[in-house]
């Protein structure tokens, strides 16, 4: 069954991620576009470095041609933000990226983008699912890829230069050149290996690179930049005396950072740092947006700068929509995805990395020094998180307890409010909070907590875990 989650459709390769299902999904999208009066439109198709991604992109293009659409196929593995940029730049009504982003190597998937290069919202994906439900594999129309290419029914191109030029035009290249920074870079075997390297070397950064070869198994590790997966980058930063360490996830829409002391910088801090820099040092004005599992320190900083912070459900489509509605400066999530006003309407780890490098160059301060400046004014709340793998039956039982019976544990302190709009979030009277919610991309129950002390944040997680018998 094809079911879209918070980050598109993802499934295990050879289980549900099959040629048959890819063709069905694309046929469903084509039928939707036909009903919207878009017959014959150009549609962007891109793919990452995962196993079968290129082949899957070609299967998708074959179906588009079969229904009379004109695929614009990016002819090499590329960052997901490039696909979003292309949809926006070429004014295409839809686009797709074959990727499972930061998921384990056994997964692949498809992200769908709408006009302006936005993540397809729940209304669009529900309509695609409804169209798929009316189809059988025998109903799907297609034209052989090579035949369609020869007849000019498919366009192959690489808009990478346009994308990189748009980022270079948006950052202070001269300041970065003058700073002559040494950067450790870990693309995690993913698609940013050439694009981010080109961007940073154009800015005359001295690069030290690891894990840039094509490996569909991602070195046997999760292609997600976190405190565990970035230990090799931390060692590189210390060994090569780098000013900064940068990593991106498998499809380059998320950013991970190691500071000059070899310490992992949490995505929560990165979001706060970039918002603070853009408002305080660049002089921008406007609110910010975060999801419900992201640090409330962003709220404190926004309030201190005379701005507002908006909370939305998990799923970057909600962040993007609220950013557009409020003309927000930045929007992001605790997993490392962020978007900045004036660029694409979605998360972009490459652009975020460029802004972070500019931040160091312009301020002349390290990441830790700049965050200390923020912490002196707004505090430094502590963070804890944990993931628990779920079976289908276990998930159903927990959903019954959490969202039907509305059960919550006794945390032994005053509760300000409980919100069950997206997961179950308990906010306490002292400003601390804890949330548990089911992942929209993997069979996991995720928990996150924030409090004045690390012990208290971890206690919230333990209380939930014990209450749910995990």
Please describe what each predicted stretch is:
Residues 1-67, 93-94, 148-183:
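An N-terminal, well-structured beta->alpha segment
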Residues 7, 45, 83, 96, ...:
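Buried hydrophobic positions in well-ordered alpha/beta secondary-structure cores of metabolic enzymes
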Residues 39-108, 198-258:
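N-terminal small/polar loop signature for handling phosphorylated ligands or for N-terminal nucleophile
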Residues 75, 130-163, 260-332, 338-339:
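Proline/glycine-rich low-complexity loops and linkers
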Residues 108-238:
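Gly/Ser/Thr-enriched, mixed-charge loops and adjacent short helices
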Residues 112-115, 256-260, 340-341:
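Short beta-strand-to-turn element immediately C-terminal to the catalytic PLP-Schiff-base lysine
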Residues 121, 209-211, 263-282, 349-357:
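Gly/Ser/Thr-rich active-site loops/lids in small-molecule metabolic enzymes
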Residues 238, 244, 284-470:
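Phosphate-binding and adjacent anionic-ligand microenvironments
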